[in-house]
């Protein structure tokens, strides 16, 4: 078995730069950035460190082979060539999942069956047995076929890394934790930041911002698939957990305030903050956005209700308009609003300094970024429909 592995960390589009910084910070080597994924190198300790510490990626996978596969024979041979006996014990359970895109082999179930057969044959030959009970630890095998090139991977994470362990329940259409962590990074949240959210929902944006400010590792409250893998010793997990705990900075000046008109959401946000260990830094209250007055030094991170969280588009537009009016009267250090509403700037009443295309799960969104802008006259002028090309023609009058 090699001393170092090639690892893959998929992430949502728009999160790659933040994820690269995180990987550099934990000592990953040979980091390469692609669309929606990063590859890097590291030993067994890196598998533990990456799963425990990465905030913005979806999972960590061990890349076992990359090879051309236009036929089932080629698919089988590429899988059989992997030294599975060094990774999987004789009693391992090994489900196979994957996808195929723009490839000759289009049937995912058929590919799953071929890959499973190849692993079974290799393990039987190398373990000198005719029986594989699959009663032991689960090793999830994943494959990806793209343009007749196959990647075979072993999942080290289990449930996605957005499952932090603190959000037991959520309101409708919550923001994904990994995306919230990326927004906190783009918003330049620091140890002494003051952060506010007028549409806090179940509190995810502020909780992720607090954990970032306090350097609380996101994976401390959960378990990972690779904790049962024989080639990642339990001692490494214990060491990495202890290291993460030691690097936490609980005594910081960070403070966050979240508001929502729904008392149930506020109660849930408070419960989630307590589970996340940031209840002393995050404060949630019932309040209407019409009463929101951002503090001058505040960074506002928010996910305005839209789509599943609103019954009508008109209702969402009205809330965005109200937010714009309140922000015009109470300017702050910056506003970072993530929404699927492509007309947000028109409703809000001001063009963003910068926009970034992102995804909340499978929902395409835009992050609208406003930095230290002067007061402006709020007039919700109509704007032309626009895609992601960044072209805009409407100007808003400034005072």
For the regions a language model picked out, list residue spans one by one.
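Non-catalytic nucleic-acid substrate-recognition regions in nucleic-acid-modifying enzymes
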Residues: 2-137, 398-399
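Short, charged/polar, Gly/Pro-enriched secondary-structure boundary elements
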Residues: 45-52, 159-162, 376-378
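A short, flexible beta-alpha/helix-coil linker loop
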Residues: 101-104, 160, 305-309
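C-terminal edge-of-domain segments
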Residues: 141-157, 368
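SAM-dependent Rossmann-like transferase core, predominantly class I methyltransferases
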Residues: 152-186
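Conserved S-adenosyl-L-methionine
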Residues: 175-293, 308-309, 313-317
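C-terminal catalytic and target-recognition region of SAM-dependent MTase-like enzymes
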Residues: 288-398
